[in-house]
Each structure stands twice: as structure tokens, then as C-alpha cells.
């Protein structure tokens, strides 16, 4: 519904007005208007389209003078109103004309006669109908009335009245010639530049002098707002003028500085850069590019552009073009250096010696990319540093954990604000040689998804056929990486993309045995901690038996990081006792170690091993090396369902279904009643439920636990097993046998069952572990069942 209005002085005589009021019905239809507040003495024109309002207009025509009640909503909304949202004060209006316009709407002209108060809503459909009472104007002191209206008119005339009122045509003439104060008041109210919702107070106020007083208040608020707006505009104008002035002065100052000093400084920089370009052994094409950029820098007057060009030239000239470090050519010295810094790790050391031997023989850098894979704490990162030291090369380390932007590898294009070179060339710059040992740490922790794929950017870096012309986006020129010895590290090879794995030579760095840890602790870690804490081996005495006790009862890890922290704690407590208690020597033994480290964190699992029903020790290969994977099975009355818990992956779940299907198919041979599967539900649980578990190698363990639970046979203590099971009961090969065997030995097991196909991998298991374990190869699950149960 659209509204238009024309502010008019009432043209009815008092007699005509009273005659009309005598004919008004006590119940009238209602039209709800929006956008404007109706005030008496106003001529309204409204476009009506709502069906219910059209019916209300039709109903009004049945009374003598076509009367309706006009109401507004509390929020002046355009939506169809609810009764609760209608104002209780409105106006009585008379329809003067009703003209049909296109689209079926009507343009209706109303004359506003008097204020009314709604008494009761009588009906809602098909149109709104109300009973009402007229709001009669209450008159106060005539002297006060005249004084107030005079003050209002003076206030309006004091300022350009267009600032206070709207629709100013004939406004002044009307209020000057209108004899009735009430009419003047209503005309001013309607024209005041205030929100229509604020005008509602005038509609419900019956006392004339109060209405005039409200006008004075609103005019005062408008005047304050106008003054505030004028002050704000002046401040904005002043700020703009000051900014323009400041900009002008700064630009002028730049020009003066350029003429006086900056110009000389820039010329000095240009001469210095030109000299560097001349002395640096750049390839011809790159030297030409550098001189072109220098020419651009010389002629550029824009500070932003000059800054980018200067950064580019600085980086280009900081790169070690053709600069190499002298490699160590004595294999015996290289081997000795590696052995002095790291215990064990023979496979990696042997590979580095081969690399050095080939380089010495061919006088060329072998194109090899090594990837050290193993659990945390086994020395992968520190070994890379030792390799650099043994070969006589610089060492650069870049951690790739959490890296997700390709630009971190290749760099940003110089068109971007804050562009920087990638990590590869930044590392080469820091090394100051083109043949460093470059460690790409945690390559399995790259963030790779449909949005990010930094692994693809590494393909060019790690491909010997491509990295001779590696292109960094920031440098925009090829750089030779063929002399760099790249070494990557990873905890879990499955997380490394296949394309990257294909470009690297994988070398497994396995978990340490107890013997390894004792040697590392006594020969390396303890000496390091004694030095770090300012004491000697006479101040802190700890023998190998105590170190073994620490390994078994205070650590549970594939590497030696926790062991190193424990030795550091013992060193700190020794220093404290030496200073406070004036001791010269602290001897740590298995009997007093709890005094310094507290109670044992891990019990000896060998003491915990008992004969159990439905519980078998599996062997797992995780991010952190090998570990035990207990499998528990129970069953209860049900409908033959299989319940799997312990945060299992899809492959592990399939192994459980396969094991159960094999047992169902062979229940007669196993001495199991077939009805037990239909009458019971089976629950398979792998403890430590918060840790995700997956893989096929638990099939043999699940099958053994199921048979034990169903037949109520005890499983011998000290057993562990690993292997994938098929529906025929065959046991297939698994990975990570070495890590699993070390974990079994560390956990106190004495016998493990492994797939027959893994016999070839037994040689990889350390001799001391092989000697302590009874390793039984099996090709079918029946071979396991015949040996694991207590007879």
C-alpha cells in the first residue's frame, strides 16, 4: 500500500463538522497504513491493493459519509499486521474520492477528522472492524497556549525552516494565516523532520498545550543535531584539508631529499650493486637480467617499485652462484666422524660412505635423494647434521610439518605485495654454498588436500632430472640444485605421496633395542647432560644396570628422547644436592632411583603376562615404532551381531569379519557348536580406544581371541602374533616385522608367531632380540591354534 499526502488546512465549518460527527457509526472498518503517521488536518492519498482493505473500503461506503479508522503499526512495517502490533490510537477519516487504477488497485483520498482511541477489535475477517471512542482535545490556559505557539513559530523562523520541516510549499503562509492554534499545531507536527514513530505521542496526547510543548522539545533536538552535524562537517573538511596539505608537503620533502641526499645515496647503492653484479660469477643470461633490473631501479621514481627491485637484486646476488665447500675425501675419516656422533644406524652410515666413495671416484655428485623413515627419537634429524659435518658440508634444515602453500617451496611471484623467495632457495642462500646437506624434515606432515598440494612443488626439487634448472617464482630464473645432498625424514611412509616416494631412496631407521639404548645413554646422552649441567662423571655416577632399569620402568619409546630427559632430570637433581647438601658425589642405583624420579611409570610387562581367555597380544607398527596391540573378545546372548570398538579403521574391521567368517565356516573342525553364532552377539575390543588403529595384520590375533572366547580355552602367557588372515585361514605377509619384534622383546614377550612369508625378514631383527625371542613362522591359522592354547 502506497501513501501520498497533502497538508491542508481544514476547509469545513464548525457546523458542517458537527453535522458529520452526528452521522458517524459507533463501529467502523479499519485500514492500516504504513510509512507515515496520520495527523488531523491532513489530506491523505493512499494506493490500496490489499484485499481485506478493499473490503473495508467497500464496507465504509455503506455508511452515510464513508467513514473509516486509520491505524498504524508499532514498527511502521510493510508486512500484514497482527492485532498485537497495531497502535491503540488512530484517526477518524472520511473517504473523499476513490479512483481505480491499473492492476486492480485503488487510489483513495481521505480527510483526517479527529483522533480516536480503539475500544475493542470486533472482527478480523473478512476485514478488520473496531469500536472506538473519540479523543477530545483538552484546552489549557489561553495565555500559555499563545505563548507556546509564538515560541514555536519563532524557533522555526530563526533558522532556515527547510532544515526543520519537510514539504515546505506554502508552509509559512498556512501557519501565518490559520486562526486556530490546534490546526497550526497539527500542521507543524505533520511537517516536522522527525521519525514518524516519534509522532505517535502527538496522536495519543489530548492536551493541546502539551502537544505544543512536545513540538518545542523536538525542535530543540533538531537544532542540537544540526549544530552537531555542522561541527562534524567542519572537522571532516578540516581533516581533508590537513591531509591534502600533509600529502603535498611530504611529496615536496621527498623531492627535496632526493635532490639533496637520497639521490646521492641511491647512486651509491646503484654503484655498489653494479660492482657486485660484475664480481659475482653469474650465468650470462642471469647477469643480463640483473643489469636490466638495475637499470629499472635507477630510473624508477616510485618508492614501492624501487623497494621490490632492490629486494630482488639483493637476493639474487646473495645466492652462492658456483660457490662450493670442499668435501672430505677420506672415507676412514668420514666413517670415524659418523661413529663418533651416532651409535648404530649402520645402514644409513653405509649408504653415506657409498655416496662419498662414488663422488671421490667419479668427481661428480651422485644424484641421490635419501629419505630416512623411522619412529620419533631415533636420531634421523641429528644424523643428517652429522652427515653434513662428516662430509665437510654446510647444513640446512627446513621443517615441512604443517606446510600447505606451494609458494612456501617455489616462492611468491614478485607482483604480490610482500613477495618472498621459497624455502629451498632461501636455505641455499643461508648455506652460502651450492652443495650443502639439505634436510627436508617431517616430509610426511605436509598438508595435502584439494586446496593445497605442496608435495607437487617438491617433485621438481627432488627429481635429479629437473632440479638442475629449478625455477623459483621470486627469482624467475633457473638455479642448479644438482649438487645439493637432499635428505628427507618421515615417521610414517604411508603419508608420503607415491610420486615423492618414487623419487627418493627409502632407508629405514628402526627402533633401538635395550642394548642400543644402554650404549647410547652411557656413551652419548649422559656425557652431554653432564656437560650441559656443569658436572662430571665423578659427581653423578650411574651404571648400566640402572640405565636398563630406567629404560624399562620410566620410558616406553622407540627412540631415546624420554631417556635423555630423564638423564637431564637426574643431572639437575645432582647439581641441586651438590650445592645445597654440599655433596661431591651422587650415586644413582635401582634402589634409590625412585627418590629422584618418583614412582615407576611402567611396570615390567613380563610380570603381568598371565594365561587368559579371549585376550591375545597382537603386534602393531605405528608412527612411534612397534607396539603391543591387545585384542579382547567376549560374547553374550543376542542375534549373531558383531560389535567392533576401539576406533578401528576399515581394513581392521574387514579383518575382524574375515576372521569370524573363517571360524563360522570351520566351526566343526574347531569343535564349536554352529548354533552359538546365531544365539549370541560377539564383541571385539582393542584397548586404548582414543587411538586410531588400522591395518590387516591383526587378523591372526582376532581369530585366536575369538576361538579362545568361544571354546573357553586359556591362551599361553608371553605370546604375541602378527599376520593377515584369509577366508581359507592362510596367513599372509606383513610389514614392520623388525619394529614389531623389538616391541615384543621390550614388552617382555618370549614367543611370537609371524607369517611364513616373512622368514626372509628375520635377518633384519637385531641379533640380541632374535636370541631372546622364540620366533615361530606359520602359514595357516591351524598352525597357531595347535600351539597357543593351554592343554
From Swiss-Prot:
It is found in: Cytoplasm. GO terms for biological process: cellular response to heat; protein quality control for misfolded or incompletely synthesized proteins. Its EC number is 3.4.21.53. It catalyses: Hydrolysis of proteins in presence of ATP. Its main location: cytoplasm. GO terms for molecular function: ATP binding; ATP hydrolysis activity; ATP-dependent peptidase activity; sequence-specific DNA binding; serine-type endopeptidase activity. It comes from the Bacteria. Residues 610-791 form the Lon proteolytic domain. Induction: By heat shock. It holds the Pfam family AAA. Residues 28-223 form the Lon N-terminal domain. Keywords: ATP-binding, Cytoplasm, Hydrolase, Nucleotide-binding, Protease, Serine protease, Stress response. Signal peptide: none annotated. ATP binds at residues 374-381. It is an enzyme of class 3 (hydrolase). The keyword Zinc-finger does not apply. The active site is at 697, 740. One of its GO terms (cellular component) is cytoplasm. InterPro entries: AAA+_ATPase (IPR003593), ATPase_AAA_core (IPR003959), Lon_bac (IPR027543), Lon_bac/euk-typ (IPR004815), Lon_lid (IPR054594), Lon_proteolytic (IPR008269), Lon_Prtase (IPR027065), Lon_prtase_N (IPR003111). Homohexamer. Organized in a ring with a central cavity. ATP-dependent serine protease that mediates the selective degradation of mutant and abnormal proteins as well as certain short-lived regulatory proteins. Required for cellular homeostasis and for survival from DNA damage and developmental changes induced by stress. Degrades polypeptides processively to yield small peptide fragments that are 5 to 10 amino acids long. Binds to DNA in a double-stranded, site-specific manner. Belongs to the peptidase S16 family. This is Lon protease. It comes from Aster yellows witches'-broom phytoplasma (strain AYWB).
Amino acid at each position: 500500500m502506497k501513501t501520498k499526502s497533502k497538508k491542508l488546512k481544514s476547509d469545513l465549518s464548525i457546523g458542517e463538522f458537527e453535522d458529520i460527527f452526528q452521522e458517524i457509526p459507533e463501529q467502523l472498518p479499519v485500514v492500516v497504513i504504513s510509512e507515515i503517521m496520520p495527523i488531523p488536518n491532513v489530506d491523505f492519498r493512499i494506493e490500496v491493493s490489499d484485499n481485506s482493505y478493499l473490503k473495508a473500503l467497500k464496507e465504509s461506503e455503506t455508511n452515510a459519509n464513508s467513514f473509516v479508522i486509520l491505524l498504524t503499526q508499532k514498527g511502521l512495517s510493510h508486512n500484514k499486521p497482527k492485532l498485537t502490533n497495531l497502535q491503540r490510537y488512530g484517526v477518524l477519516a472520511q473517504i473523499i474520492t476513490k479512483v481505480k487504477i491499473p492492476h486492480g488497485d485503488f487510489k483513495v483520498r481521505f480527510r483526517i477528522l479527529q483522533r480516536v482511541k480503539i475500544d475493542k477489535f470486533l472482527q478480523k475477517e473478512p476485514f478488520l472492524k473496531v469500536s472506538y471512542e473519540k479523543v477530545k482535545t483538552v484546552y489549557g490556559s489561553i495565555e500559555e497556549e499563545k505563548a507556546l505557539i509564538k515560541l514555536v513559530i519563532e524557533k522555526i523562523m530563526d533558522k532556515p525552516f527547510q532544515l526543520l520541516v519537510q514539504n515546505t510549499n506554502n508552509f509559512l503562509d498556512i501557519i501565518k494565516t490559520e486562526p486556530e492554534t490546534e490546526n497550526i499545531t497539527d500542521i507543524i507536527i505533520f511537517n516536522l523532520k522527525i521519525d514518524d514513530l516519534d509522532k505517535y505521542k502527538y496522536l495519543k496526547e489530548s492536551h493541546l498545550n502539551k502537544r505544543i510543548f512536545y513540538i518545542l522539545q523536538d525542535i530543540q533536538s533538531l537544532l542540537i543535531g544540526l549544530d552537531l552535524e555542522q561541527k562534524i562537517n567542519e572537522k571532516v573538511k578540516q581533516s581533508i584539508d590537513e591531509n591534502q596539505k600533509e600529502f603535498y608537503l611530504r611529496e615536496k620533502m621527498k623531492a627535496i631529499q632526493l635532490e639533496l641526499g637520497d639521490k646521492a645515496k641511491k647512486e651509491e647503492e646503484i654503484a655498489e650493486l653494479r660492482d657486485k653484479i660484475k664480481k659475482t660469477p653469474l650465468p650470462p643470461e642471469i647477469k643480463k637480467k640483473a643489469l636490466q633490473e638495475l637499470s629499472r631501479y635507477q630510473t624508477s621514481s616510485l618508492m614501492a617499485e624501487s623497494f621490490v627491485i632492490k629486494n630482488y637484486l639483493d637476493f639474487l646476488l646473495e645466492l652462492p652462484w658456483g660457490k662450493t665447500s670442499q668435501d672430505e675425501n677420506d672415507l676412514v675419516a668420514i666413517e670415524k666422524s659418523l661413529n663418533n656422533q651416532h651409535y648404530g644406524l649402520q645402514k644409513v652410515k653405509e649408504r653415506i660412505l657409498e655416496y662419498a666413495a662414488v663422488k671421490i671416484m667419479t668427481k661428480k655428485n651422485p644424484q641421490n635423494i635419501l629419505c630416512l623413515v623411522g619412529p620419533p627419537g631415533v636420531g634421523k634429524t641429528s644424523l643428517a647434521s652429522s652427515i653434513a659435518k662428516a662430509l665437510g658440508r654446510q647444513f640446512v634444515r627446513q621443517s615441512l610439518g604443517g606446510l600447505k602453500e606451494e609458494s612456501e617451496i617455489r616462492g611468491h611471484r614478485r607482483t604480490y605485495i610482500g613477495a618472498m623467495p621459497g624455502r629451498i632457495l632461501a636455505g641455499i642462500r643461508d648455506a652460502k654454498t651450492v652443495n650443502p646437506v639439505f634436510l627436508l624434515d617431517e616430509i610426511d606432515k605436509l598438508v595435502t588436500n584439494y586446496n593445497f598440494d605442496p608435495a607437487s612443488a617438491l617433485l621438481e626439487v627432488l627429481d635429479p632430472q629437473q632440479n638442475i634448472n629449478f625455477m623459483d617464482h621470486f627469482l624467475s630464473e633457473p638455479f642448479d640444485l644438482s649438487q645439493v645432498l637432499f635428505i628427507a625424514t618421515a615417521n610414517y611412509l604411508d603419508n608420503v605421496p607415491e610420486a615423492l616416494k618414487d623419487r627418493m631412496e627409502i632407508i629405514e631407521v628402526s627402533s633401538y633395542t635395550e642394548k642400543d639404548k644402554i650404549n647410547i645413554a652411557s656413551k652419548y646422552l649422559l656425557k652431554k647432560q653432564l656437560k650441559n649441567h656443569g658436572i662430571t662423571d665423578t659427581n653423578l655416577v650411574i651404571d648400566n644396570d640402572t640405565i636398563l632399569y630406567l629404560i624399562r620402568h620410566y620410558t616406553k619409546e622407540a627412540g631415546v628422547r624420554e631417556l635423555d630427559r630423564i638423564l637431564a632430570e637426574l643431572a639437575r637433581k645432582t647439581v641441586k644436592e651438590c650445592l645445597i647438601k654440599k655433596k661431591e658425589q651422587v650415586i644413582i642405583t635401582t634402589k634409590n632411583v625412585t627418590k629422584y624420579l618418583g614412582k615407576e611409570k611402567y611396570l615390567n610387562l613380563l610380570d603381568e603376562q598371565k594365561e587368559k581367555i579371549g585376550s591375545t597380544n597382537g603386534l602393531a607398527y605405528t608412527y612411534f615404532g612397534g607396539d603391543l596391540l591387545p585384542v579382547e573378545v567376549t560374547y553374550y546372548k543376542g542375534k549373531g551381531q558383531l560389535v567392533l570398538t576401539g576406533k578401528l579403521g576399515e581394513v581392521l574391521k574387514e579383518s575382524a569379519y574375515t576372521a569370524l567368517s573363517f571360524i563360522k565356516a570351520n566351526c566343526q573342525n574347531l569343535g564349536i557348536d554352529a548354533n552359538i553364532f546365531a544365539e549370541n552377539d560377539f564383541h571385539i575390543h582393542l584397548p586404548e580406544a582414543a587411538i586410531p588403529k588400522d591395518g590387516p595384520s591383526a587378523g591372526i590375533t582376532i581369530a585366536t581371541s575369538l576361538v579362545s572366547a568361544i571354546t573357553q580355552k586359556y591362551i599361553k602367557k608371553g605370546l604375541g602374533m602378527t599376520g593377515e588372515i584369509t577366508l581359507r585361514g592362510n596367513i599372509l605377509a606383513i610389514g614392520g616385522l623388525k619394529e614389531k619384534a623389538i616391541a615384543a622383546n621390550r614388552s617382555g614377550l618370549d614367543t611370537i608367531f609371524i607369517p611364513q612369508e616373512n622368514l626372509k625378514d628375520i635377518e633384519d631383527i637385531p641379533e640380541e632380540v632374535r636370541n631372546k625371542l622364540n620366533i615361530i613362522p606359520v602359514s595357516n591359522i591351524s598352525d597357531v591354534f595347535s600351539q597357543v592354547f593351554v592343554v
